[in-house]
UniProtKB/Swiss-Prot annotation:
It catalyses: ATP + H2O + a folded polypeptide = ADP + phosphate + an unfolded polypeptide. It is found in: Cytoplasm. Its EC number is 5.6.1.7. It holds the Pfam family Cpn60_TCP1. It comes from Acidithiobacillus ferrooxidans (strain ATCC 23270 / DSM 14882 / CIP 104768 / NCIMB 8455) (Ferrobacillus ferrooxidans (strain ATCC 23270)). It is an enzyme of class 5 (isomerase). Forms a cylinder of 14 subunits composed of two heptameric rings stacked back-to-back. Interacts with the co-chaperonin GroES. PANTHER family: 60 KDA HEAT SHOCK PROTEIN, MITOCHONDRIAL. The gene is groEL. Keywords: ATP-binding, Chaperone, Cytoplasm, Isomerase, Nucleotide-binding. This is Chaperonin GroEL. One of its GO terms (biological process) is protein refolding. ATP binds at residues 30-33, 51, 87-91, 415, 479-481, 495.
Amino acid sequence: MPAKQVAFAEHAREKMLRGVNVLADAVKVTLGPKGRNVVLDKSFGAPTITKDGVSVAKEIELADKFENMGAQMVKEVASQASDEAGDGTTTATVLAQAIIREGLKAVIAGMNPMDLKRGIDKSVIVVVEELKKQSKPCKTQKEVAQVGTISANSDDSIGKIIAEAMEKVGNEGVITVEEGSGLANELDVVEGMQFDRGYLSPYFVNNQDKMVAELENPYILLHDKKISSIRDMLPILEQVAKSSRPLLIVAEDVEGEALATLVVNTMRGIIKVAAVKAPGFGDRRKAMLEDMAILTGGRVVSEEIGMKLESTTLADLGQAKKIVIDKENTTMIDGAGQQSEIKARVEQIRRQMEDASSDYDREKLQERVAKLAGGVAVIKVGAGSEMEMKEKKARVEDALHATRAAVEEGIVPGGGVALVRARHALEGFKTANHDQDMGVAIIRRAIEEPLRQIVANAGGEGSVVLNKVVDGKDGYGYNAATDEYGDMFEMGVIDPTKVTRTALQKASSIAGLMITTEAMVTELPKKDDKSGGDMGDMGGGMGGMGGMGGF
C-alpha cells in the first residue's frame, strides 16, 4: 500500500477551498445571457468551445492532490444537478462555492461545523418550499419556447424548435438531437410507432420512386421466433388472401423457403406482403413485440403462451391504417389497439422506469413510452463548422432538458430572482441555537450569488442591482440580456422550478459535507519514474528476428 499524506484542520480547509475556487471560477464565467465561453483542449482533434458548466467542470483536474479533492467534490455538484434536472449546473456550482466560502469563514471563527450544517439543511427546506409557492405551471407553447431560449443562452431559434417538437409529439414523446447537414436547424417528426428495421427483401418495395413498401390498412402478424418453413404459414396466408388486405410479418427472422415464397407471391400479385425483423434483442425484443401487439390490437404468436403459427387466425393479427417500410425503418401509423390498453401499458412501462438502475435502460423505456403514447421528433442541428456544431448541439440538449423540467414542475422568475425572493421566508426563521442560525444566514447570503454573478458577467455591479431587485416584488428583476428591469415572466426570463430547486439542494448537500471536513488523506505525489530508460538495448537484440522471413 503506497504511503499517504494527511492534512488537518486549517491546512486541509484552505487547500480544499482553493480547489473549489479554481473550478468554480472557471465554471461561473459561463453564467447568464452575457456569460463567456470556455475553451477546452482535447487530446485529439480541435479544441471544444462551450458555455455548459458541467462540460467545463468535467475537464478540470488539479496537480495538487488536496486541492483536486476540493475541485472534484464541487464537480460532483454539477454532475448531480445535470443528471437530475439536465440543467442548472453553473447555478449549482456558484451556490456551492458561496456556501462553502461563507461556511468555512464561520468554522474559522469558532462555530460548530455540525450545527452550521444543520442550520443550512433546515433553511434549504424552507427555501425549496418557498420556490414551490412561487412556481407557475408551464402550459403554453410560448412559455416552453421561453424556457428553451433562456437555457440555450438566449437563442430563440432553439427555444422555438423545441416548443414545436414538444407540441407535435406531446410531453411524453421522445425528442432526439442529431447533427444536421445544413446551416439551419430542422425538425423531423415521426408520428406513430417507428423502429429501426427495414424490409428483408427489396422485392417487397411497391413505391419505386421513394423505394419504400407502403401497406394500406394491413393485417400485422407478430411472431417471436424465426420463420423458415412456408408450411406453418399457409393457413394464415390463405385467410389474409381471401380478405384482399395486405400483410406485414414482424418476426425474429424470415428466411429461406418462407422468404422466397412470400417474394414470389408478392411479385405475382397473389397477396401483398412485407416482412421485417423484430427490433431489439432478448427480453427487450419480446417487450417491444408486446408493445406492437397492444398498439395494433393483435397478439404475439408465441409458443410460450401455447400459440402456434399454423393455428393462427385473423383475430390474432394486429391492424393499422398504414405501414411504411424503407430500407432501414418501419413506421406503423394509427394502430387499431384499444386506448385503455395502450394507456395501461404506458403506465406499466413508467413504473419500470422508476425502478430502472441504469440511464441506458431508462432511455430505452422512455423511447417505448414515446412510441406508444406520442411519436418521435428529431431536431437536426445546423452549423457552419464542426466546432460550432458540437457547441450548439450541447446547448440544444441542455435546453431540451430544461423544457422537460419546466413542464414537469412549473416555472419561476429567472435571472436568480426566484432565489432572492425566497430569502424573505428565512427572515425571522429561528433554530435551536446561535450556530444553526449562522447556517441560515449562510444560505441567505449564498442564494444572492447567482444574481450577483449574472450581473458581474454582464459587466454590472452586483450589489446595486441586487438592492433594486430586493426592493421590487414578485417577478420583478433584472434582464441582463437587455439591461432592463421589469417583470421577468413578461420579459420571458424564466427558469424551470426543478432546475433551481435541484441546484440549491445538490449544492447545499455537498457544501455541508465539505464544511464538516476536518482531515484529508491522499497518496503522496509520485517522483518522476525513469524505469523506461533501459529499453534502448532491445533494438540490437531484435535484429535476429530477420530470419523469420523463411516463413
